[in-house]
């Protein structure tokens, strides 16, 4: 068990169903369990704290109440810090929080702080960055742009980006698994990588019909990947992906858009201080 005396709280009030009332309740919840709230950070307006700033303030715990994308940014920013990160369900999908704590609300999670211990968590490393939950590589990652339009309530943007995403899934540069050489030689419109304790779980998504593209797109919007048409390709300790025509690889890292070079190697690594 870890004893945390002082904490920093990172919130994104615009993430998921977060409300000012929920953020205020969380701010009160830490002191209620004997932890001094030494610093509060509201993203994206405030800058994330550095490891040196946290250490100087005697802060040993960072609690993150935000979506998966903000969580990934904070974890990447704090990589190498000796303190602990508490993951709370503050977004829409909350995949990492669910993996660690189930579907419990943050109040129940906070109540366990006096008995909570840090966990080793597998993550994925590549030249494009670190992902703690999942990676989607290929033109299918463009469906994330549609999801962003849905977040902002921009109907026109949703319509136009949905058309672009469907066209990209149908005719964009597919991605192949080159090391090891597995899966379809013509590649996939989306390859999903998930870190597990036994290896990188690999799934390939290659829709063959318009109906398949619609089904796949809806699955991507919900980040419910397994409900879309896909192939399970096995478990590997590391994997190399390459675009079939040498163009940059479109990416979705923990639900957030990115882009990598024409070839990318992903390998397992550990995050030691998540709770």
State what each model feature region is:
Residues 1-3, 54-58, 125-126, 169-171, ...:
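Flexible, charged surface loops at secondary-structure boundaries
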Residues 10, 40, 80-201, 206:
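Catalytic core of DAGKc-family lipid kinases
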